[in-house]
């Protein structure tokens, strides 16, 4: 079998040739090549299982194995990332009825980085920063309201790998002392461009502190945004989201002065909230 982009060497790769071939076959199945020819129905898709999976193959199996490759999904990401701890990703789509966006990285210990839910009135657009353990492929999967699954891919080479998902420094409490920074600006088309920056270390549980002790996992798990008390965006995040998570999205039909409220919860059970208003 001709090697696929899944089979490139990464800083986590100590895999046998057999595992590499399995990953390559899984990637083909993932995009519906040599597998199913129709999008999976909602009954065949286990998004929760895909998010919880610890291997790329398990994530694919939970998704039903064969999202259809779609040219209606656009990925804006670097082909070469200098820092694997913070790789900027922007996803947009013109797929009708898009309701969920998943980001997966095949070379990461935790394949699914984030799972975004986009209610009616919210554009199929999201911007964030993720961690990559080494060279790999970003898979973007979008689910539509008729149960269809569609995907696009983007290969990324990492100059300095995020092995262990290193974060700078060992002190996290000062980082949590400040509130989230929220900016929501109304454009000429009546859409609010929302940008949220949350102060949080997003510890992966895979690195040691300066004393050589393993730093426990500690990260934001759930994120929700309301506009004028209406849910407009939500997400589930994993250890593969960069520290101080940045999430940007767009909401149509917004008005100047409407109140935007952001709430998030982390693995300690702590919940925080911040508010802002839509401006011009």
Question: What do these predicted regions represent?
Answer:
Residues 155-161, 277-280:
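Short beta-strand edge segments in extracellular beta-sheet folds
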Residues 198-214:
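Short amphipathic, basic-aromatic surface patches that mediate peripheral association
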Residues 57-82, 172-187:
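N-terminal edge beta-strand
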Residues 1-16, 27-33:
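N-terminal secretory signal peptides
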Residues 43, 160-181:
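Low-complexity, Pro/Ser/Thr- and charge-rich linker/hinge segments at domain boundaries
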Residues 145-151, 265-274:
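Short acidic/polar inter-strand loop motif in beta-rich domains
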Residues 120-126, 240-248:
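Aromatic sugar-binding surface patches on proteins
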Residues 35-68:
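C-terminal segment of N-terminal export signals and the immediately downstream linker at the start
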């Amino acid at each position: 079998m001709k090697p696929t982009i899944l089979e490139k060497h990464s800083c986590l790769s100590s895999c046998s040739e057999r595992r590499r071939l399995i990953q390559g076959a899984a990637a083909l199945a993932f995009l519906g090549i040599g597998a199913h020819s129709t999008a999976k129905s909602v009954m065949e898709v286990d998004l929760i299982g895909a998010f919880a999976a610890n291997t790329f193959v398990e994530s694919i199996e939970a998704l039903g194995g064969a999202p259809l490759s779609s040219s209606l999904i656009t990925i804006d990401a670097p082909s070469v990332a200098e820092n694997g701890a913070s790789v900027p990703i922007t996803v947009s789509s013109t797929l009708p009825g898009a309701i969920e966006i998943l980001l997966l990285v095949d070379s990461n210990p935790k394949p699914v980085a984030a799972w975004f839910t986009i209610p009616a009135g919210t554009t199929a657009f999201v911007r964030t920063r993720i961690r990559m353990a080494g060279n790999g492929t970003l898979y973007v999967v979008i689910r539509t309201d008729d149960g269809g699954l569609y995907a696009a891919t983007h290969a990324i080479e990492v100059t300095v790998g995020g092995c262990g998902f290193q974060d700078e420094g060992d002190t996290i409490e000062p980082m949590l002392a400040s509130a989230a920074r929220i900016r929501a600006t109304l454009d000429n088309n009546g859409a609010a461009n929302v940008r949220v920056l949350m102060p949080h270390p997003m510890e992966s549980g895979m690195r040691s502190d300066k004393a050589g002790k393993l730093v426990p996992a500690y990260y934001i798990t759930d994120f929700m945004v309301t506009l004028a008390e209406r849910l407009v965006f939500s997400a589930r995040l994993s250890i593969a989201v960069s520290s101080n998570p940045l999430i940007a999205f767009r909401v149509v039909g917004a008005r100047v002065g409407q109140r935007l409220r952001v709430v998030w919860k982390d693995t300690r059970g702590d919940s925080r909230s911040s508010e802002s208003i839509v401006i011009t």
